[in-house]
A protein has these predicted regions:
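Membrane-embedded alpha-helical bundles of multi-pass transporters/translocases
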Residues: 1-180
Length: 180
């Protein structure tokens, strides 16, 4: 994950934030789908580990990238509406992430329960899981994250704040701030 964070700035500087976001999410969706087809075996274990390392590195790129895109939205809003709304944008983004984590975590547990996952929280005892629960676990590690990444690609495809547009906004903001 830290490697991805370190790579974020040079990659986004070279290709642009929007392009980087889309490319990283496409790569995440491909790796996630491939994860489903890795056999459960000794060799498969190492392939799963490698896939998760790559997924973690790509996720590392996403974290700073998304926050820098929030800053771009803040600059865009300030330039367009002539008022700073940085606090509102960052706090609502943080709240949305918290809601997403809560809903996503709950949804995973609801899916596992619906698929017959067996647990005994009192003893922590391990159980042999039914095939439906094992399939659900594999989908939670593959197809579901891939679908979320594809949705993110579709949403960000219409994101208008390209590198050129942000250079324009930054120049206008500099003038606007000097006049205030």
């Amino acid at each position: 994950n830290m490697i991805g964070v370190a790579l974020c700035v040079p990659i986004a500087a070279r290709f642009g934030k929007k392009t980087t976001f889309i490319a990283v999410n496409i790569a995440l969706s491909v790796l996630s789908v491939l994860f489903f087809f890795i056999p459960v075996s000794q060799t498969g274990f190492w392939l799963m580990l490698l896939a998760q390392i790559l997924i973690s590195m790509l996720t590392g790129v996403m974290s700073p990238l998304v926050w820098s895109m929030y800053a771009d939205v803040s600059d865009y809003a300030e330039q367009k509406y002539k008022t700073a709304s940085t606090g509102l944008i960052f706090s609502s983004s943080s709240m949305a992430q918290k809601f997403g984590g809560a809903i996503g975590g709950s949804a995973a547990l609801w899916l596992l329960a619906a698929c017959g996952y067996i647990s005994n929280p009192q003893t922590g005892e391990a159980f042999t899981q039914p095939d439906s629960a094992l399939l659900c676990l594999r989908c939670l590690m593959s197809f579901i994250p891939a679908a979320v990444s594809i949705i993110a690609v579709l949403v960000v495809s219409s994101y208008p704040l390209t590198t050129a547009k942000m250079a324009e906004i930054d120049a206008q903001l500099k003038i606007q701030r000097q006049n205030d």
